[in-house]
Amino acid sequence: MLQRCIKCGKTYDVDEIIYTCECGGLLEIIYDYEEIKDKVSEEKLRKREIGVWRYLEYLPVKDESKIVSLCEGGTPLYRCNNLEKELGIKELYVKNEGANPTGSFKDRGMTVGVTRANELGVEVVGCASTGNTSASLAAYSARSGKKCIVLLPEGKVALGKLAQAMFYGAKVIQVKGNFDDALDMVKQLAKEKLIYLLNSINPFRLEGQKTIAFEICDQLNWQVPDRVIVPVGNAGNISAIWKGFKEFEITGIIDELPKMTGIQADGAKPIVEAFRKRAKDIIPYKNPETIATAIRIGNPVNAPKALDAIYSSGGYAEAVTDEEIVEAQKLLARKEGIFVEPASASSIAGLKKLLEEGIIDRDERIVCITTGHGLKDPDAAIRASEEPIKIECDMNVLKRILKEL
């Protein structure tokens, strides 16, 4: 097991605390896949409790006693029959990551990231966040007894997420700027070795997130979807999920790979614009804006990995408007009973748009990833809903309303 630069190929020991290569390239974790292949099988995996740590051989942990867990993973994969009829498609699933302990997919990364911090003997961890990362890191820091500092863009974080980070006991700092400004600041703290950085620039955190791919295959009885649609903000998740599918293929668990499709908000779509030009590099947005706060990121750190995932898989990238996001959020709630935050609904909005554009075949088996629970941002849901009806204690009025249902 080692760290390898995706740009120049230089390798580093796994115990070296480094976030990017000397050349500036992003790092990824590489394993002895032949050794994993000898150790795992579908049958062996199935005998273990479902969750992130079911797939231990694929995770960068040397000492199991150092694992920090809140029973993350094992999230439901819903067959969405009502949405299939609504959208006119054959087979649709939603992988609901809002069912994780702190309500988002970030918990998968943090269980591995904070475990790694444990192995390294780190005492102080930190991150910049649009909300979910801070909530998750704060929870896992509390679980492990570590000190935690999180930087958030002032006034740009949904209250549900802010409340979590504060209540778990992290030192919460609000920065007068955007997410990218906050990230620059924590990266400097990490450079000066004042914190162990657990944003998705840290390759160990992404190792936990790749287990989404493992679970999808597991829950589909080792079948592979034709396409996986992922909301894209800092771009770590789509990269991690693609890596998970590839590692299952390398080790003989599956023999096909899905098309990875990334969805960004129209006000923060540097990866989509790069994809349209078939470019390898993005042009950052200086002032990203969208109702989907979790993906309101103008300069995604993992853009090179995300674009590689999209290009290598024959996938696609598309942007959706705030109006399309809200419509999809309502559609998912009212047709399937799944309540997600706005950023999560971008995967459904993107599916709908790409079906209308003829990019996605209606016979495909599709999995949409929803990344966070609706209670993360209840204000957005309330703003998008009708006002509750107010009445006196009058049964006649109540029955009249009942007839109008």
Swiss-Prot record:
Modified residues (N6-(pyridoxal phosphate)lysine): 106
Entry-linked InterPro entries: Ser/Thr_Dehydratase (IPR050147), Ser/Thr_deHydtase_PyrdxlP-BS (IPR000634), Thr_synthase-like (IPR004450), Thr_Synthase_bac/arc (IPR026260), TrpB-like_PALP (IPR001926), TrpB-like_PALP_sf (IPR036052)
A Gene Ontology molecular function term of the record: threonine synthase activity
Signal peptide: none
Entry function: Catalyzes the gamma-elimination of phosphate from L-phosphohomoserine and the beta-addition of water to produce L-threonine.
Record-stated family: Belongs to the threonine synthase family.
Protein name, per record: Threonine synthase
Provenance organism: Methanocaldococcus jannaschii (strain ATCC 43067 / DSM 2661 / JAL-1 / JCM 10045 / NBRC 100440)
Record gene name: thrC
